[in-house]
Amino acid sequence: MKSAVETGSGLQTMTYREALRLALREELSRDERVFVMGEEVGLFEGSYKVTAGLMDEFGEERIRDTPISEEGFVGAGIGAAMVGERPVIEIMTLNFLLVAMDQVVNHAAKVGAMFGGEVRVPIVIRTPNGAGNQLTAQHSQSFDGWFAGTPGLKVLAPANPADARSMLKAAIRDDDPVLFIENLPIYKLKGEVDTDDDNPARIGRARIAREGTDLTLVSHSYATVRCLDAAETLASKHGVSVEVVDLRSLRPLDVETVVESVARTNRAVCVEEGWPSFGVTAEIAARIQKACFDELDAPVERVGMAEVPLPYSKRLELEAMPGEGRITAAALATLEGSGVLRP
């Protein structure tokens, strides 16, 4: 099976899924040490078809199907990385990575420091998270903050196809363990990708996804898509100019870009798909409060998942999620509280 998306064909429109597949194909071709391993990544072509066609192209040795044992094959990947290989592990959902949390947190993230830098662990763990597909409480969680709080582990979460390709390439070439977080609804998102540009992204750099002057929305992954929708609504219906900062990387975290934005707009709303208590938005809000204390015209607001096990009901699921409506409401409340808008 040959993909319609090819390297070196200039600027192309492709889905997030296709951008990931292109990055994998490019890195598998570039470096023989790279291999892919996970449940159904080969014959079935991946649960989300990211690895479609790769087994036909690179063979069973480099596109390896595994048993249903996340702890086992993540551990095998760590071992392979320690002896010089560059494994890319696919986990069907971030929820299942909890089964292998000891391998990730106590081994992959710590081996480099415990061996004084003499041993590196260049492993990439790809996995989607998030809600919106009626997969209920155990398959709809976002544990981004849990892993981002672990020293020694890099955590990336791109929000568009171009970043998905360039950041996955960067992750594969990095000498440290990288958790590469994707999102189920975002796989079908389309965007332009420059296939002539083989340069990997710089890990640890946020991007300004939309410029604005009245308020800053800070987010990552699919929450960035929702923030961009909210920013458009705020502009068209309320005349508000909103800046959107896409973090892209949770660890390392680009605090400087966030702080520079909030210092300009004087207001911030932080958005994540996870539960807000002890989460990513709590960390971002704390960083903003410390660095921008004198510039803030209103308290930093946070929007996240309702703090309940997610129900199956579609209506209740949507109400629990940090959608465009809740983000817009939080932004308006922040603006009204600082006198920009009248209630």
Segments predicted by a language model, with ranges:
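Thiamine diphosphate
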Residues: M1-P177, I181, L318, P343, ...
